[in-house]
Amino acid sequence: MKKITMIFNTVLIFLVFLLISGFSWHKSEIPTQEKFFESKSFSLSTVLEKVIPSVVSITVEGNVTQSTRIPRQFQSSFNKKVLDCFGISRCMTRQGKFHALGSGVILDSKNGYIVTNSHVVDRANKIQVQLSNGCKHEAVVIGKDARFDIAIIKLKKVKNLHEIKMSNSDILKVGDYVIAIGNPYGLGETVTSGIISALHRSGLNIENYENFIQTDAAINRGNSGGALVNLKGELIGINTAILTPDGGNIGIGFAIPINMVNNLTTQILEYGQVKQNELGIVGMELNSDLAKVLKINVHRGAFISQVLSKSPADVSGIKPGDVIILLNRKPIASFATLRAEIASFPIKTKIELGILRNKKVKFIIVELKQKIQSKIDSSVLCKLISGASLSNFRIHGQNKGICVNYVNNGTPAYRTGLRKNDIIFEVNKYQVSSLSNFQKVLKTKPLILVLHVKRGNDVLYLVTH
């Protein structure tokens, strides 16, 4: 009994010793607050030393035309006759200048190529780029695409540029730490940090292609075109937009994923533009209600309601009722995501789609083809109305005119008085029920265009020359 007691006491003393020594060891390993902040391993300075020389500040100058229409209450029949009699336009315009600020990222140090947002350099007459060392240089636009809000500008004969290293945006995860670098409010290079709040965001502007990275890193006006990088200093996105009620940062910023940027810039450098692809489907978001009706366990993807005849989708065997859930083995978050990804690929790219059909996943290879334009960019047809996007206006399946989808501010179309949702039904006294009719008139290269336009309940003439 005495022997057992001695053994028990020995074991107890040993356990107490381990407990005390273990506690002391763990206590010594825990860094103090001072050591935490003094340690270089917890600073972003080393990363920023590599990245900041690749980010530039952009200053833009250009001309803008502001239009003012005579208020409707003063447009009585008598007043209209008086205005017409004296040749006074109902739409008054004045010329002015504008200045804009933005950021950019050096993609190619050898050729001086910089990527930025299309809206940063839109309507620019002069572009000045300031490098991180303070040197200023002139730049020119190589190409841009407003649908993706991407542009490439080029510096002339500038040496010793520092191009940024790229990451793979397909491997990003919500919660990853990120750093935003740009030129907010013209302050110069400014660094903020945060995390990835969400991926595959869309819906900010239904006219454009969107597949954004969302971040809470502070992004403000002037940050557009700047860099969003990971903790290795690799570029993961181009900062593009913020969601804000008053113009300031509220922790909701958006960046274009770098993989999409690479697809777009490759096309701009090769063709001077982005050649939009066509899959040839009509569809919608797959949500929980639709999934319940279809009796499937998938709640994200793109539901196909129609496949266009002889389109790449049709040729490849895709059918109405299919649900696209994978693109190149990556999950598809929404129809908007699929639309943006498809449009950004170079033409003739072969993609692999994961299709859910009859509750089974089937993989289909599709070769993309350039989209046959159902809309026209009028700048290709006639400089008199450049800046407007037009499409056929249909009622009960029949063409009844030409719809103005949107008009860029300050363009000839805007100065003429064209506005979004206008319906053009007559040009130079010729009835135009479709784009093909309109093209016939424009091919005569008229010096003046007289557009008969329906706007809401009003009918008006617009003259451009």
UniProtKB/Swiss-Prot annotation:
CDD domains in the record: cpPDZ1_DegP-like, cpPDZ2_DegP-like
Pfam families the UniProt entry points to: PDZ (PF00595), PDZ_2 (PF13180), Trypsin_2 (PF13365)
Annotated catalysed reactions: Acts on substrates that are at least partially unfolded. The cleavage site P1 residue is normally between a pair of hydrophobic residues, such as Val-|-Val
UniProt GO MF annotations: serine-type endopeptidase activity
Keyword annotations: Disulfide bond, Hydrolase, Periplasm, Protease, Repeat, Serine protease, Signal, Stress response
Enzyme class: hydrolase
Catalytic residues identified in the record: 119 (charge relay system), 149 (charge relay system), 224 (charge relay system)
UniProt-listed InterPro entries: PDZ, PDZ_sf, Pept_S1C_Do, Peptidase_S1_PA, Peptidase_S1C
GO cellular component: outer membrane-bounded periplasmic space
Disulfide bonding pattern of the chain: 85-91
PDZ domain span: 268-359, 365-457
The EC number(s) this enzyme carries: 3.4.21.107
GO biological process terms, semicolon-separated: positive regulation of apoptotic process; programmed cell death; proteolysis
Region (Serine protease): 102-240
Major location (coarse): periplasm
Residues that coordinate or bind substrate: 222-224, 279-283
Family to which this protein belongs: Belongs to the peptidase S1C family.
Protein name listed in UniProt: Probable periplasmic serine endoprotease DegP-like
